[in-house]
Design a protein with these regions (language model features):
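N-terminal signal-anchor/start-transfer transmembrane helix
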Residues: 12-27, 155
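Functional transmembrane alpha-helices
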Residues: 15, 88, 126, 135-156
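Alpha-helical transmembrane segments of multipass membrane proteins
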Residues: 20-24, 133-138
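Transmembrane-helix signature of multi-pass solute transporters
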Residues: 46-50, 132-135, 155
């Protein structure tokens, strides 16, 4: 089951992909945009629950193992820049907490923002914000952490 670590990018990737898709939604499809954003956040929440179960041992004890997935981003001469993501018990708990609270915010916003004409833009930026926050949690390279931090600032 630890092979799933190579797919952990889906947790922040789904909200970011949702933000990109929502940016092309027409302003008249307000309810569809809200349900689409909530659906992508719900899938991220389910994926974070899977990561949480991976980070915990089947005997109920918390594992101290850090699972990482690295790949080469680019090579410059003899220098190789490798980036990736990691999963340990602490960020597994944080992934569950952030995706759960984000999902609650997304669901609450359906009713709260239903009369706002810019709800599609709201959900696009909210999805981008949630994806960047989740990217902060799984990054294992300072450059990716900084990029996600800047996107959080941009989306807020």
């Amino acid at each position: 089951m630890s092979d799933w670590i190579s797919y952990i990018w889906l947790i922040p990737g789904l909200p970011v992909l949702s933000a990109l898709i929502l940016s092309f939604f027409p302003a008249t499809s307000r309810k569809g945009a809200a349900y689409f954003a909530c659906g992508s956040m719900a899938l991220s929440f389910i994926a974070s629950l899977i990561c949480f179960s991976i980070a915990n041992d089947s005997s109920g004890e918390v594992s101290v193992e850090r699972l990482t997935h690295n790949f080469t981003w680019f090579d410059v001469g003899s220098t190789t820049v490798r980036i990736g993501w990691l999963l340990d018990p602490l960020n597994a708990v944080m992934l569950v907490m952030v995706t759960f609270i984000s999902l609650l915010v997304f669901i609450y916003s359906i009713g709260y923002m239903k009369k706002d004409p810019r709800i599609v833009r709201f959900y696009a930026f909210l999805s981008l914000f949630a994806g960047a926050m989740l990217g902060l949690l799984i990054s294992n390279h300072l450059l990716i952490l900084f990029m996600c931090w800047e996107v959080v600032g941009l989306a807020s």
